[in-house]
């Protein structure tokens, strides 16, 4: 499981780290742990894209209602993935999305205001039963 205290970041850079196994999003600010949020991530059959990405586009009140009240798009080259709110709050804490990161609307609204464009987003962790990389 991801443990925020083990990460060392550049002093001024904000960063988001998402642990798919734990369904947790950690926000670092000024190089220090700032806030931990529960989230929903992709199903094992439609996984969230593990790797290092960046927030490249943000919108308040996206037209597509299932995205909740905020959308923060990531620069994943093979699809459209982002961090967003939800119209299904019961889904938070589960592997249930098509790969995006879902948050409670009040949490994504708070995070949205803290995250500038270009913020690094690291998606880490394994799904249960997934083989460990050599």
Stretches found by the model and what they are:
Residues 4-13, 43-50, 59-134:
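Exported/periplasmic cell-wall-interacting domains
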Residues 2-44:
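A structural motif detector for short, solvent-exposed N-terminal "entry" segments of globular domains
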């Amino acid at each position: 499981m991801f443990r925020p205290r083990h990460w060392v970041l550049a002093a001024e850079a904000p960063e988001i780290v998402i642990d798919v196994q734990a369904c947790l999003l950690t926000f670092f600010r000024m190089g220090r742990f700032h806030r931990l949020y529960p989230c929903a991530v992709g199903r094992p059959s439609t996984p969230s894209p593990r790797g290092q990405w960046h927030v490249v586009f943000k919108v308040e009140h996206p037209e597509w209602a299932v995205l909740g009240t905020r959308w923060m798009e990531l620069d994943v080259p093979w699809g459209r993935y982002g961090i967003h709110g939800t119209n299904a709050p019961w889904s938070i804490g589960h592997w249930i999305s098509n790969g995006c990161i879902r948050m409670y609307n009040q949490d994504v609204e708070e995070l949205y205001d803290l995250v500038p464009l270009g913020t690094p987003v690291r998606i880490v962790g394994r799904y249960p039963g997934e083989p460990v990389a050599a």
